[in-house]
Amino acid sequence: VEYHEFKRTLVRLIPNKYLEVGLRMIYNIEQQISKYLRGQILAASSVAILSILGLFILNQFGANITLILFIGIIAGLANLIPMVGPFFGMIPAILIALMNNIGNDAALFHKIFGTIPSPFFILDIILMFIIVQQIDNNFITPILVGESIGLHPMAVMIVLLIGGTLIGPIGMLFAIPAAGVIKVIIGEIIFISKNSHLL
């Protein structure tokens, strides 16, 4: 309700001469934000599935991690914070592995790759989430979210880097939709400059 009231107020502020351009710009921005949200949902779902799959594989080697669906969902939802999201699933996974394996000598003396000590599979869990995070950072978010708003994957990574450098995690959260909105505005400015005789 508040958004629609804001939108009506915004439309009333547009001069009649530019009403068509203004309405088209508002529509395109809405479409851009909608596509971004769909891309984020797909990316979050992908991270959740990868996290669940990774924990399931660790369980086949005796990690004894329960609630893997819950942990995967946490990792997926936290993925809304670019770059660091998957790590939020790591903490409950480690805590559950510790609680479930107390008194389990096999888990206590477990070695990752058979050589590196990893008590209670802690290093295994950390490594798994690092892998998920790298897949997300380099493939899932740049491709799914970037394509959803028409930005090249490399451009997405640069935008995230700039947002994170300037404002931190909040900057990373809003960097991509802000870039999408700027892209729409620049597109409209170019359109107006090329078709000024029609206005």
For the regions a language model picked out, list residue spans one by one.
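Juxtamembrane/interface motifs at transmembrane-helix termini
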Residues: 27-29, 40-45, 57, 92, ...
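Hydrophobic alpha-helical transmembrane segments of membrane transport and translocation systems
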Residues: 104-105, 111-199
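Active-site activation/catalytic loop segments of kinase-like enzymes and analogous catalytic loops
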Residues: 95-108
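Alpha-helical transmembrane segments and their immediate interhelical loop/hinge regions
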Residues: 1-96
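A short hydrophobic/aromatic micro-motif that marks alpha-helical segments and, especially, helix-coil
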Residues: 16-18, 30, 97-100, 165-167, ...
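Detector for methionine-enriched segments
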Residues: 25, 83, 90, 99, ...
